[in-house]
Amino acid sequence: MNKTYACSDLHGMYNLWKQISEYCDDTDTIYFLGDACDRGPNGVKLMIELLKDPRVKYIKGNHEDLLTLYVPYLLEGHFDGYSHWVMNGGETTWNDLSKFPEEYILFLLRELDKLPLSATYINKQGQEIFLSHAGTDLNYTKREYELRGKASKYLIWDRDHIFADHPTDEKFKNVYQVHGHTPVPNLEHKLLIPFYSKPQKLEALSYCGGRKIDIDLGCFSTAKTALIDLDDLTNVKYFYDLEALGGEKYD
């Protein structure tokens, strides 16, 4: 039976993706919720594989957004603003990407620019699963996002929504969200600044009355990631980069 999964925020941790890829069958579908690049050493390789893999539905994250924003300037020798990308872990990506021919870099930029900001999956239980990188406050309608001109920034950068309640409107009664972007320790402590715990007992976090699930385990710091079954939101598989953990696996 075909399965549908979601994972997110692998940040160049290729060994984790390799495990996920081998775990999933050829006929499965994998929603990747953004942030393949930056911080870790193999972000470019990971992005290329995700774009090529027919099982993967790739959704843009804020780090893909930063890449497509700054790389065109870097190719022209303009380094204004580059420090912002570096602060967000972009140096490893640029050092790797700059080794490729410019034609291929431009091709990759075009492919990343095409990535959607969100997707909706109706699972086998009839639940409507809204998938995006950062998650969002569903109390805002799409039209309100358009009027504010911030739809893309909200869907890939927003963290304020973690304080919002699920909409009471009848049309949202069967809607759920799965997202990444905010590492679970941040969300648990209601911190909007980087905060990472050790990976012991670090798991995907269901919150907002069970309507939202955060699957970002901060894998660059914890070497642990989550793969959630979108047809059974209680079924989450965890993967570890044992090499990064020094051979020690955490529960």
Locate the predicted segments by residue.
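Divalent metal-coordination and catalytic microenvironments
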Residues: 9, 35, 50, 61-62, ...
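Active-site environment of divalent metal-dependent phosphoester hydrolases
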Residues: 11-15, 38-41, 65-68, 138-139, ...
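Catalytic phosphate/metal-binding cores of nucleic-acid and nucleotide-processing enzymes, i.e., regions
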Residues: 6-7, 14-18, 75-78, 100, ...
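His/acidic metal-ligating clusters that form di-metal
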Residues: 104-189
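N-terminal active-site segment of His-dependent metallophosphoesterases
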Residues: 1-49
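Acidic, His/Gly-rich catalytic cores of divalent-metal-dependent hydrolytic chemistry
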Residues: 164-251
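Active-site-proximal beta-strand elements of phosphoester/diester hydrolases
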Residues: 3-11, 128-135, 213-215
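Active-site neighborhood of divalent metal-dependent phosphoester bond hydrolases
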Residues: 43-47, 51-121, 125-127, 164
